[in-house]
């Protein structure tokens, strides 16, 4: 396709931290370009999932193509690709950005720059995108436009002199944003090959059409009837339909170079069209794939078990359906003595895990128990093999283990200067090692290397509480480091409960064992016999607490009486309790499994 026909196309996305008004700005742009009539407008048009609306976050990438007549009289075609804003979905963000030539950096004029938008902005600059700063929420009394501009320049390092000040809520200055998109973001450039190359930005499952993929055509064109090949898997598919979203789905006769739209090619599940992969023509393939594709690796694992064992087949079916839409979700069957049959699931992070569990419970009416989330450790065995371990109860016997390695992440925290001390204390508590502190304008950037296991559970919540909600966090995986790790097992009346095993640093083992026993003592109801709760490392018991038995007062009917008579009755009761203990089973309530999560609180 010639550069003339691409001259009036503008592909852009919006980079913003959660809650800075990205979806509202998108709504206004759609309204101004006439994508939807006023009566069809609803808040957050592009957040199609009810959980996205409720939590006010964007999870999946969406796109919309809008015609816009600029003030110079020309009609431009704006392709807006929506990106998720949360750190769990950073790979999806990088793929959305790779499909664009420019990005709007939306910053809340009242709050200033936050870490997540910094990370995504760096990704955009690395990929050579033109970044246009937009200051949102200027209608708020606390908005400080000059401070926000200074922060963008100091923290991100891009010129904010021409930043567009808008209020997405009231619609103020939205036309200036559209003019900035048209005049400051460059049109798509022709590539070095004329063979078809299309980047898959996202894929989702449609009950009637099968898998629908959102693609950006880099070169060549896609028409219904052409045979395409997915470059990472080598599979070929026949294209049924192509089109764009306006935000409604609209069919076209072809998608040309520079355009963003959807294709439907009878692919059965989303693993057949992985995000970030390249599509090309099967008969005349491109010489190489587009750069940047990687398999999504789950970083956090947890067991999901149905409360009612009869729901197991329904849980499997629900997970299968969710996986059609969520390429990052992994699961395999797992059985646990304490919990019965369920699944071991892998997620990108804690938010991803919460969303999956919420969707299973809400959309499929399942009642679920989840075990404490763990990260993936690497275990070097004595025979030299390295195995990934996502479940503490699957740790090989200690005489076969040479060393255990934990994942380390690099965390960048942005905070106002007042909270630096609190945040450093928190990071040190979490076994972090400091990399550097930079003072950037009115913000401070603190960099730490932290064990991922410490970050996964509650680091985000604690960071928000020590900084009164002002600090923001972005992190990425670095490497695996060896350390003195042990598995703490929980025994109840001498039986090991596999779902309560945790892997901890040796220096924390005693404290965690003690806390776990105390917590379990509160949560396990009293039985007719004593319940011994023990925490053990290997064969060594490190802590114990006992839930005392409920007992009947057998001496009530002896008034004065002889002491030997009383002793006889007490001995008889003791015998009965002993027998009961041998045959009795302790039911462990759901709260006890979640106790592992709350121990640090």
UniProtKB/Swiss-Prot annotation:
It comes from the Bacteria. The keyword Acetylation does not apply. Keywords: Cell inner membrane, Cell membrane, GTP-binding, Hydrolase, Membrane, Nucleotide-binding, Protein biosynthesis. It catalyses: GTP + H2O = GDP + phosphate + H(+). It is an enzyme of class 3 (hydrolase). Pfam families: EFG_C, GTP_EFTU, GTP_EFTU_D2, LepA_C. It is a peripheral membrane protein. It is found in: Cell inner membrane. Its main location: membrane. Residues 7-189 form the tr-type G domain. Belongs to the TRAFAC class translation factor GTPase superfamily. Classic translation factor GTPase family. LepA subfamily. This is Elongation factor 4. It comes from Xanthomonas campestris pv. campestris (strain B100). The gene is lepA.
